[in-house]
Regions:
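Short, Lys/Arg-enriched N-terminal segment that forms or immediately precedes the first helix
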Residues: 1-8
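Short capping segments at the starts of secondary-structure elements
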Residues: 13, 24-28
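A short acidic, leucine-rich amphipathic alpha-helix
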Residues: 31-35
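Short, hydrophobic-biased segments on the C-terminal half of alpha helices
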Residues: 47-48
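Glycine-centered, phosphate/nucleic-acid-interacting loop/turn motifs that mediate DNA/RNA or nucleotide
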Residues: 53-54
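Basic, amphipathic "hinge/linker" alpha-helix immediately C-terminal to the N-terminal HTH DNA-binding motif
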Residues: 58-79
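Amphipathic alpha-helical dimerization/coiled-coil segments
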Residues: 77-101
């Protein structure tokens, strides 16, 4: 069964971390492995998935966000940050009137 784009973006910590890393610009595999503290085989599996879904591209041994990735990943980052705020302060937010938001 084919994964949805939503699944590809959010269901793997490795993929999320890689996409967020590539927001800072193109990286080679050694930079990716070092920054994310991962081995080649597991991260290459995730890279292939992201490339298959046209979220990243490779050129001259550098991986970078594709045009689609450049649109989606900043929005993904914002959503993740929002989830993090709401999750950390759940008791506070559950009792607030947020209808004006």
């Amino acid at each position: 069964m084919e994964s949805s784009l939503l699944d590809v973006l959010f269901l793997s910590e490795k993929r999320k971390n890689l996409l967020l890393l590539l927001l800072d610009g193109p990286k080679n595999i050694e930079e990716i492995k070092s920054t994310l503290d991962v081995r080649s085989s597991p991260i290459m599996t995730q890279i292939k998935i992201l490339m298959k879904h046209d979220l990243i591209v490779e050129s001259n041994r550098l991986y970078k966000l594709s045009s689609i990735g450049e649109i989606l990943v900043p929005k993904m980052k914002t959503i993740l940050e929002t989830f993090n705020v709401l999750d950390k302060n759940h008791d506070y937010w559950i009792n607030q009137d947020m209808t004006s938001i």
